Amino acid sequence: MSHLAAVLSLCVALSAAAAAPQRPPNILFVYLDDFGWRDAGFMGSDFYETPHLDSLAREGMVFTDAYSCAANCAPARACLLSGQYTPRHEVFNVGTRARGNGKHRRLQHVPGTATLRPDIVTWAECLQAAGYRTGMFGKWHLGTSPQEQGFDVAVEHQKLPGFEGHLGPDGAYLADALTDAAIDFIEASGDAPWCAYLAHFAVHTPLQPKAELLAKYEAKAPGELHDHVVMATMIQAVDDGVGRLVAALRERGLERDTVIVFSSDNGGYGPATDMDPLWGYKGTYYEGGIRVPFFVRWPGVVEPGRTAEPVIGVDLYPTLVSLAGATAPDQPLDGVDLVPLLKGEVPGLGERPLYWHFPAYLQSYGVFDEQRDPLFRTRPCSVVRRGRYKLHEYFEDGAVELYDLAADIRERHDLSAELPELRDALRALLEDWRGRVGAPVPAANPEFDPAAEQRALERARRG
């Protein structure tokens, strides 16, 4: 072959390679249950050990101001899978039952639904349509079946034979079993791009230790922030599984071709962990109940670092669809695509408002953490954050609370009386949003008994 012919042949080959469509990345999405904002080493825990998560976080982009769309499990997951705020899909609470004593509820609980409607297209369905093999492992919590809403393979934690909570037959541990299932799925996917949604049941109650780790944490000096031995074993079990998953990716040469996303469905379980300096915990709409750990790691694409850009669970839908090169459906989506931010193509997302709507009640665990209300973790409310300011609006009496999160992340200094113009502007923004998305506001409860509520409050405060 002449030199000229060889050069032309090489140019044609290079041109063809450049024109060939790039294979989309695999996606490993690890989503924990009741894992608090401070519960990982990379978020400051001084007792729980998460070396594998910490390593991934150092190599990815960590979002310090990341939020779940709800303060408890089912609505958070419905928002995540649908890309919609709660008023659109109407999964407002865990189950549709009212919480607490009916005589203590001034308003009627908006029932909503416990099932993600079949007409809502999930991001998993979008990925399926784009040629992805999809798998879901762990907690679904949205009724029907994951396989009816976009997952080729589904291993639901409640359907694993012989398991009671986190404990299985012959010493099996749930976090290990779910990790095994995810690894099996990856191995069976061949050359197809895949998305593994590993939705651990950990660290939800019942708090059950991984037995072989107990002695380690019983002998460990307690931290100033965390000291719960059983919780520590549960967290390490998850982290060890993450380490095994990364090792499996490396063995198969998939690490650089796999995006790893990590987050939690809501704040931590108040009686067992601490989100300090945040106030509140799972079930409250203070920062401790809705701010969650979140990072995205994709070697060579996502620039490592930390950002205080506020993001929220509904952002994951357009982000996952974008990462996969898939097509978004013709339905309302409330989030924004984070890929330009992850790639460093934009400096930020602008001062967009983030919203929460909870027209229901969640009964209290008990009196601790100087909580607002000893009877309910949360009463019916809406919340908005725009920039550094966050407004809570309560429907029972129309009360509002306004906080400057940059100066008062613990939400202890209510500015609603000091900044009336800002208060009214944020309240109007919230009312306008409720109108646009059809958010229901609960009506008066005919069973409410003010005297019974007062007696219950007095008993609770006395302990």
Residue ranges and their predicted role:
Residues 159-164, 182-230, 269, 275-276, ...:
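Active-site His/acidic residue clusters
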Residues 179-186, 215-258:
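A long, amphipathic alpha-helix that forms part
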Residues 19-25, 32, 36-37, 62, ...:
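Long, internal low-complexity/basic segments
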Residues 29, 37-121, 126, 132, ...:
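Active-site segment of extracytoplasmic enzymes that catalyze sulfate/phosphate-ester chemistry
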